[in-house]
Each structure stands twice: as C-alpha cells, then as structure tokens.
C-alpha cells in the first residue's frame, strides 16, 4: 500500500527528488526533461523563478509548478500559467502536466489536477492536450473539462484539443497558492 499523495507548490528543498524524477522522465523520452537532465538543480531554480515572472521563455506568463509527492518521491508535475496571452489562448493553455513514467495509470495526474481545482483555481482556465494522448484526455474528462475546440499545432505536428476547466465547487484559494 502506498502512503498518501501530497500535492503542493514546488520548493527548492525538493531538489533531490526532482533529480530522480527528471532522470526517469528524461530516460523515457519526455522532451522537457531531456533538456532538464543537463542541470536539474538549475532547472528547478528556474521553475521557481517562473512563479515570480522571472526568466520565462518568450511569450510565457508567470507559471507556478506543483508536485504530487509520495513521501520523498515526485509522482507528477503540473505547471499553472497565470494570465492570458496569445500563447495560452492559441496552443499552450494554462495547465501542463506529466506523470512519472513508472507511476502512470495510477490516477496521480487526476489527483493533482483535482487538488488544483479545489485548492488553487479561482476562475476557469484553458487546458489542452495532444488528441492522441488518450490518458490525458481521460484525466481532463474526469476533471470535468468542457471541450471547446481542436487546432493543429504545426510546431509539434499534431492536433491539440482545448478544454475549459473550472474550479471545483467550494472555496478556492489565491491563484498563486
């Protein structure tokens, strides 16, 4: 039996767990983590700076990173982009997430996204995914995502589905929690 999953914002003290997470995700071929493998500690520092609007990739809004953890292990990562711009509206959406490859199919992404809806979101956001990603489509459906449209993303050469995702019923916290 697994210990309970804790969902929270990323911290610098997560660096040892993040190194292990990055190594596994990079080895599995996740492009973001293939880059992060070169210096995971610096990558984590950059992610934390993104929450304050610092060192952002061009066109990206401030972005807070959240982890789903089991003890000292990161099971999933979620990035919440704050605010609207052409990137969030046209292809990026407000939310991006990945699950540790060895923990896929266990409901971890669903848990982290549901936690975000209950504890962080204060207004609806856009969430998008490659329409060939059946697991992500199931996670978004389970979270109550309302289908908006489908667009071709030339850079990734795939069709992206866009959904509206609302906060869960009940009190929400600050969007920067």
Feature map (PLM): residue ranges:
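Conserved acetyl-CoA-binding loop-helix of GNAT-fold acetyltransferases
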Residues: 96-99, 105-118, 137-142
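Conserved GNAT acetyl-CoA-binding A-motif
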Residues: 120-131
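Alpha-helix N-capping/helix-start residues
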Residues: 12, 110, 131-134
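GNAT-family acyltransferases
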Residues: 1-94, 98, 119, 154-177
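Conserved active-site alpha-helix within GNAT-family acetyltransferase domains
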Residues: 132-149
């Amino acid at each position: 039996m697994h210990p309970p999953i804790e969902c929270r914002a990323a911290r610098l003290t997560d660096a040892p767990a993040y190194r292990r997470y990055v190594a596994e995700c990079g080895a599995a071929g996740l492009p973001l983590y293939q880059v992060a493998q070169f210096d995971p500690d610096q990558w984590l520092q950059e992610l934390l700076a993104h929450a304050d609007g610092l060192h952002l990739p061009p066109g990206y809004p401030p972005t807070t990173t959240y982890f789903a953890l089991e003890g000292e292990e990161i099971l999933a990562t979620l990035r919440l982009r704050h605010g609207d711009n052409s990137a969030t509206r046209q292809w990026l959406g407000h939310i991006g997430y990945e699950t540790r490859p060895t923990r896929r199919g266990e409901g971890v992404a669903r848990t982290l996204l549901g936690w975000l809806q209950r504890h962080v979101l204060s207004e609806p956001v856009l969430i998008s995914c490659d329409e060939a990603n059946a697991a992500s489509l199931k996670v978004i459906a389970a979270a109550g995502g309302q289908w908006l449209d489908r667009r071709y993303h030339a850079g990734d050469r795939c069709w992206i589905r866009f959904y509206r995702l609302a906060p869960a019923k009940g009190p929400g916290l600050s969007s920067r929690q």
